[in-house]
Amino acid sequence: MASTSTAGDRIKKFLGIPADERLNDTACYVDGSFVESEPTTQDFLNEIRPTVQGTLNYLRELFPFVNWIFHYNLTWLLGDFIAGVTVGFVVVPQGMAYAKLANLAPEYGLYTSFVGFVLYWAFATSKDITIGAVAVMSTIVGNIIANVQKDHPDFDAGDIARTLAFISGAMLLFLGLIRFGFIVEFIPIVAISAFMTGSAISIAAGQVSTLMGIPNINSREETYKVIINTLKGLPNTHLDAAMGLTALFGLYFIRWFCTQMGKRYPRQQRAWFFVSTLRMVFIIILYILVSWLVNRHVKDPKKAHFKILGHVPSGFQHKGAPRLDNEILSAISGDIPTTILVLLIEHIAISKSFGRVNNYIINPSQELVAIGFTNLLGPFLGGYPATGSFSRTAIKAKAGVRTPLAGIFTAVLVLLALYALTSVFFYIPNSALAAMIIHAVGDLITPPREVYKFWLTSPLEVVIFFAGVFVSIFTSIENGIYVTVAASGAVLLWRIAKSPGKFLGQTEIYTAPRELVRGSKDSGLTQSLLQKSEHHTAFLSLDRDDLSNPELQISTPWPGIFVYRFGEGLNYVNSAKHLDNLTIHVFKHTRRTELNKFEKLGDRPWNDPGPRRGQAFLTDELVSRPTLRAIILDFSAVNCIDVTAAQALQDLRNQFDRYAHPDKVEWHFAGVSNRWTKRALVASGFGVDSLRTAKVQRENHKGGVQEVDQGPLVAIGPSVSASDIEAVPVGTSGSGSTDEKRPEGEGGATNGGMEKGSANGEDISTVPTATSADACALARDAGGKRLVPVFGINRPFFHIDVATALKSAVRNTGVVAAE
């Protein structure tokens, strides 16, 4: 470190940067003392430098299955088999239905689902999630294909979908590998709910025409136009409506019936759950049978009595490398952000939700690796963009899945369908598939009770919710995504910029016995109970806007001392607002130290012109105000500050020093937990004593003025035994000499005092450090534990909490309360 420091000093000297004495702690070094060292660039590089163990952990995280695969057992196997087969029965008809939403042949849905189930288990951090074709993503892909083919009619729909999946997968895989999974935290629940609700309404509205057999309805238009055109086309309803409406009714009836039977017969609840889960399979088999009876002599699907699925090729007929030429890449480039955003929203939201329900934590970065890898390799077998499915994940979780390996059993079932059941799929009615889609997306609509909960929690976000839904309905799903995410980001910035700070007052809080809480009318009993109860000083808002009891007595901390708590960080966005509020409040409740500073009216600044002509300047109210002595900033909600905020604090300090001249305003900081924040404050001149001697005038408790030398801070370190403690010089506090007697109970944490805690981290106290005898007495507490400083003695104006900071500020002002 010495060479690094020397090199840094040489660079500073070469560039003409003066040495900052505030960062020079040599005057504070005493053997046995705890002195804080400033974090350096080398420290930062050491923190982010990869280590051997870190690299091994990273590789282990890439393949999380190694943590559980060697513990696999028959019980897990049975649970995975049941869940995997159950999901397999659902995913086969769903996959083909969703492929139709994507403007693709039905087999593409099976390809996509197969790849997701085969690959996901090796990279999964969620046992419940299922990756495959989903309704919302399929609709987005269908819209993209339709838009691209308008300008490039020669492009094959399958090529567009596969290329889109490959590029999106590569980007997601990259984000996952560099561990950028935290970006999903920028998308709030309200934005996700609005997106899912708007998408579900759009998808359901687009499927009504297929359900009813209404021809010539463009389901790719804006949702409101689709609804209007569908209503206009009701007179043109065909026989498909009989198949579709009865299928939709059957799906809802079976679910309702199984739910009721599960409630009536709790012991058979699991059996009724499996019956409900397989309702899609029952409906598809039933309507395949009906369709075969009606159309068994039909060879051309166009000649069927109602629209049917038609030929589904067996096996993987669209395998091969995706198309990656410049022409197709430029055509889909504008739609890649939307695709990535939808993949992220659906997958991470679903996996987090089920992780909380089933008591495990997912790794968002690893989930990005999983869906990225799936979408990167899926196109080689004919897959299009795949992500997590809410309905299938819910089924899988309720079916008793034990590990992610259940996806293998689902993949086997999909593979069996691809090679053995494609001839049966010929007779599936399109209206029955539409009924399945409507039934599936209906669960994605946010219920009114949830919207009402949003309203109770944050009314502004309800506006964002409805804005996203309406934009999705009246424009497109893609625009709905952008609006909700952008609006949520704007609200976040607005809340940071307008985060309210609070001026704090103090009150005594008692741990009250039950008799006192119930309200005893006996004052003697009340006093007796209060004396027995524990109490401490708490700091609450002076504005009383925190819903505290209006009868609670909250007093100002001390005349001329102000405690300010930041509400939500301190940065370039909100620093001006916070410090303006601080300035206005201080000027309103204090006076200048020199009342007659301006001898003539013309000497006064324009923004402080004083009273009108003929009115007295020194009013009784003004004279009675205290002078500004200290500012205490509660940094418990501040993690880091930037250059703008630091400069604003420096400017405010200079302004207050001019206001309090010839006194100097002390700045105390409580709850600073980030060492880089402390470094920034120290570099700005806060938190440390001046290393040069300064003349400071203070009012003593008798009303006189006392001029004292404020010397450099000297460390005091209590030793383990009394024999090890030697007398050392103590810096004055600016309110008297070192041997001045302090009033009891006003232990300071700066120049004349130190914050100390027990070596085992249990007890914390504020103690004066005046003489070696005092240090000898304070080396151990009543329990015999060795006392050590909480923070470095070279940073005396940083305190562990507001109460300690206030004690220090009161002590250093030299003001003694009247007995």
From Swiss-Prot:
Gene Ontology CC annotation, any one: plasma membrane
Keyword Cell inner membrane attached: no
Origin species: Neurospora crassa (strain ATCC 24698 / 74-OR23-1A / CBS 708.71 / DSM 1257 / FGSC 987)
Residue ranges of domain STAS in the record: 551-708
Organism lineage string: Eukaryota, Fungi, Dikarya, Ascomycota, Pezizomycotina
Protein name, as recorded: Sulfate permease 2
Disordered, as annotated region: 726-766
Molecular function GO terms recorded: secondary active sulfate transmembrane transporter activity; sulfate transmembrane transporter activity
Positions glycosylated per UniProt: N24, N581
